């Protein structure tokens, strides 16, 4: 037995117009449907309808985590900063970490993740291999002081996340926990009706050697990914790596200096030589994290990948300013590896290693070289994976052309290994009585992000189209003339019957025009609508509408409860 909610009492202030600052469909529709409200940049209140959906997502997550053998607990949001110093992450995390002092001058952080907290929690308790493996999780608000919060719930400063942490005695045991979590996450996406693709991902500040993200495919997604239709490979643009096919530059292989007046762009140089941009070499002048000058060279038709560059040049690397270019004797648009001024480190993309005929800047205004050859004409200090992989590049597994898409990261799994346990002294005794560091995994689901991802994938020109598993209510009963006794009586009869069947019902009993009610209910997106109109009541029928398909049918009043209950229960399965 459930209890119906009446819209005359429901706090769901809808909006007729799209908010000016809402870029994504999910942001726009959640605001318009009266489900969230912005309090400050990156900070949102979840109103009753959204909160019901959030709770449903949380319960799906709980069910899958519990089924996989994980145990729920709750750790504090406020974390002693000393734990972050132990792990070495307090400075590496940067300004996104919210830090503050308590009244006694002791420093704390607001947890964006809880690796340090959970490691400290178990390090004096999990002391024997007999206690392992253990997988602990909680669902909690997290905090990250994003430089540019945007896209509504997609990139906020406060967000809801489920984070889990496993502790194992062996790598094989970690792999088992990792595989369980991957399956649980696939199940969560399926049950929430999120079409997601598991993609190889970079581990970022969390660390570890192996990571997979679950990306909800969406044209307006904030993340880029590439995938192979032939073998199933997929990776986000931060982790995607392949041997980019490059074209040899123009010329006969002899180092030749060519005047290229005013041609300081790849496009202009390629056009001048009548050659594809892939046959040119793009030189980028950088300052690494230690403040030292670097020139990075990539194929002319590819871009330097920021995440990969951070691994090579350090977090905080940046492009040189015009003043720094002048200081180091470099000329924008004409930088190249030949005759590079002394003291500048040269790092080239791995895909260029076999190329022997480069078209590149000559380190002189209005001049380029053709036929430049590594080792013969210049020395490369380091070869590294630097470029963003794009559609058309070869799949690293099967060699077929990759496709590109955009997505929303809804969850991610990591094999952390011993990064935190070694740093924080979390050890156990193995079967041979030897002390070893705990082997860890961590697993996150963005609960509030998942809400946005559902809306991003399930909407139309009229509003949200909720999948039944996460809909705030399953059925909207819409009496068009609720003050009329006959209409009110039939409404009560239907509502009582649906509630008795365990159906979640919202009743639009507001004294508003039919058109207003129809528009609002379509905007809010409840899966089924039961409309009580004057003409239908005269004929002993009500109209049943499927929000997803738009299909309508007249159903006898005394049959509608059974009909709707059957539809809802079938959809739940």
Label each PLM-derived region with a short phrase.
Residues 1-573:
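NTP/phosphate- and nucleic-acid-binding module
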């Amino acid at each position: 037995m459930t209890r119906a909610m009446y819209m005359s009492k429901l706090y769901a202030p809808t909006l007729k117009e799209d908010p000016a600052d809402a870029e994504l469909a999910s942001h726009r529709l959640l605001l318009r449907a009266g489900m969230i409200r912005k309090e400050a940049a990156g900070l949102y209140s979840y109103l009753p309808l959204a909160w019901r959906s959030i709770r449903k997502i949380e319960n799906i997550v709980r069910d899958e985590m519990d089924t996989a053998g994980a145990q729920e607990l709750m750790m504090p949001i406020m974390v002693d900063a000393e734990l972050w110093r132990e792990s070495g992450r307090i400075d590496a995390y940067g300004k996104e970490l919210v830090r503050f002092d308590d009244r006694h001058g002791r420093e704390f952080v607001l947890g964006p993740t809880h690796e340090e907290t959970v490691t400290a929690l178990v390090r004096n308790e999990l002391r024997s291999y007999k206690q392992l493996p253990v997988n602990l999780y909680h669902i909690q608000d997290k905090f990250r002081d994003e430089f540019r919060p945007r896209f509504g719930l997609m990139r906020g400063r406060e967000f809801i996340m489920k984070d889990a942490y496993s502790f194992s005695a062996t790598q094989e045991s970690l792999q088992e926990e990792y595989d369980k979590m991957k399956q649980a996450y696939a199940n969560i996406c399926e049950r929430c009706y999120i079409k997601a693709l598991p993609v190889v991902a970079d581990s970022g500040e969390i660390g570890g050697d192996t990571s997979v993200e679950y990306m909800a495919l969406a044209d307006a997604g904030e993340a880029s990914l590439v995938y192979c239709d032939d073998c199933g490979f997929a990776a986000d643009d931060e982790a995607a790596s392949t041997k980019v096919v490059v074209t040899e530059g123009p010329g006969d292989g002899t180092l030749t200096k060519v005047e290229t007046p005013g041609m300081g762009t790849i496009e202009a140089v390629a056009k001048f030589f009548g050659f594809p941009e892939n046959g040119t070499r793009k030189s980028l002048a950088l300052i690494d994290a230690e403040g030292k000058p670097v020139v990075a060279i990539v194929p002319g038709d590819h871009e330097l990948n920021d995440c990969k560059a951070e691994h090579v040049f350090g977090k905080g690397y940046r492009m040189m300013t015009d003043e720094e270019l002048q200081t180091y004797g470099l000329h924008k648009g004409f930088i190249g590896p030949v005759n590079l001024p002394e003291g500048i480190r040269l790092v080239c993309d791995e895909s260029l290693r076999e190329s022997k005929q480069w078209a590149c800047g000559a380190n002189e205004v209005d001049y380029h070289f053709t036929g430049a050859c590594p080792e013969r004409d210049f020395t490369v200090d380091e070869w590294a994976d630097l470029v963003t992989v794009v559609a058309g590049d070869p799949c690293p597994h099967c060699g077929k052309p990759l496709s590109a898409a955009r997505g929303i990261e809804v969850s991610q799994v990591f094999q952390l290994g011993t990064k935190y346990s070694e740093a924080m002294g979390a050890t156990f005794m193995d079967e041979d009585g030897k002390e070893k560091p705990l082997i860890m995994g961590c697993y996150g689901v963005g609960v509030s992000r998942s809400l946005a991802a559902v809306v991003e994938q399930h909407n139309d020109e009229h509003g949200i189209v909720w999948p039944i598993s996460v809909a705030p209510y399953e059925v909207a009963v819409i009496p068009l003339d609720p003050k009329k006794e006959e209409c009110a009586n039939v409404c009560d009869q239907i509502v009582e019957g649906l509630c008795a069947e365990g159906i979640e019902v919202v009743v639009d009993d507001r004294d508003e025009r039919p058109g207003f009610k129809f528009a609002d209910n379509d905007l809010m997106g409840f899966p089924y609508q039961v409309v009580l109109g004057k003409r239908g009541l005269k004929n002993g029928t009500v109209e049943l509408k499927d929000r997803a398909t738009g299909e309508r049918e007249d159903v006898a009043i005394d049959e509608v409860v059974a009909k709707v209950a059957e539809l809802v229960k079938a959809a739940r399965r």
